[in-house]
Amino acid sequence: MKNLQVKLKVISILLFLLVLSQVLLSETRGIENGKRYDRLVIRDVIVINGNGTPPRGPLDVIVEGNRIQSIRRASLERDAYEKEEHVLDGKGKYLLPGLINIHGHIHDSRANQSLPFEYLYKLWLGCGITSVRDVGSNYDKTIEERRKSQEGLVDAPRIFLYMRAWGRSPEEVRRNVQEVKKRGADGIKVFGMDRDILKAALDEAHKLSLRAAHHVGVEEIDAWDDAEFGITSIEHWYGIPDAALHGSQNFPHWYNYSNEDDRFRYAGHLWREADPEKLKKVLKRLVEKGVAWCPTFVIYEANRDLLRAMNQPWFKEYLHPAIEEYFNPNPAYHGSYHWNWSTTDEIFWRENYKIWMAAVREFSKMGGIVGVGEDAGYIYMLYGLSLIRELELHQEAGFHPIDVIKHATGNNARILGMEDKLGRIRPGYLADLLLVGDNPLENFKFLYPDGVQDLKEGKIISRGGIEWTIKDGIVYHAPTLLKDVRKIVSLAREKQQLKE
């Protein structure tokens, strides 16, 4: 009996040591915020790729420097990575390609108040965004910020800079596009152009291997012209329903496009005026010509539900006072037009969304490339957080969550011309990744900083929140980044109170 008790104790100790060794070996170790390592192991993780395929795993993903070196079945051997110095424990977690924000603005001020780049960058990284296509900012500053990001001198996403092309004649716009190329831009953004000037701008861009994004205003050009002249992507939705009209939109006689209250109110009437059969032809033509569509559903959401937009829960901790001031209705600020916004306006916009979302879905079914962007810093939308909301809106539009992830990763990489380097978890690709504790395919809200509240065994628990964001092999602890953002906001509010 005594020998049996001794044996049982020995067995218990051995089992304890075995379990302890497994726990120790699976723990995250040797990881510091903001560091890149010669070799990093992300162990025992479920991979959601950016190519539209379902989750796979558990897998071990090996990163060397800034590249994904290998992906293999998770090792079941206890000591497989015993000698590894830098390990992220992925057990029960999900690894995705870093999110790409295809429509961003790197603002350095709002409402005539300075806005630190650090605030934007850490919000983006904290929300899993590892690349941003900037389509409008202070270009001299942004070129320098891009250099710092490339060299790892600042904690920031990758920056792809699309500078505005302009000109009062075809000759002038060609010279401007050439200058944009010389300054090192990755592409051009065009808007507010007559047809002959747009044609010249895009022709010159093609000669110089520059991609182009188009914010189509209410102009003489529309999506037919974008297809003919070879635009890379249409931003928002302008120009697409316009191309399916028979003549002009039914504007009232007193309408003034320069009055943004008029502009956005009657934009909410446009989709219902588009001829459905003609619209299908427009979409088909865009697909045939390889034009991508970046709908940015999120930036107009205030138009269909203003009170929701004004009272987003993260404003409490993450809304910088400069942006808060900018969001207040003010005709001097672009996008701050919600004065006397009515229930009727919201009803029109809700119908607008239904038709618009159906069109994006039809475009995708035809083979069109749909991208994900946020356009934050305007109309009550915060950087990073609004991109996660955009994922939810793509799901609302009828896309499967797997396809939504593809929109924000693989598709966006294609729009950038970086599909051989970004947007997928694949050996040889750049190590832009995010690790989250719960499955975003179950609920995109798991990607928000605070995750979601759930019920387990009669108790309310928190689930979700991105744990780690990896950009160019540099490992960032997302909660630490977001803590820094909260501190920036708190200090800015204190400074503002002292002024008052």
Over which residues does each language-model region extend?
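Divalent metal-coordination and catalytic microenvironments
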Residues: 45, 61, 66, 92, ...
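Divalent-metal coordination cores built from histidine and acidic residues
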Residues: 29, 36, 89-104, 116-218, ...
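Bacterial N-terminal signal peptides that target proteins for export
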Residues: 2-12
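Active-site neighborhoods of metal-dependent hydrolases
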Residues: 176-182, 186, 244-397, 489-500
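C-terminal helical cap
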Residues: 45, 338-348, 353, 366-369, ...
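Bacterial N-terminal signal peptides
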Residues: 12-23
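C-terminal cap of metal-dependent C-N hydrolases
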Residues: 430-486
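Histidine-rich, glycine-flanked metal-binding segment
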Residues: 29-38, 47, 51-96
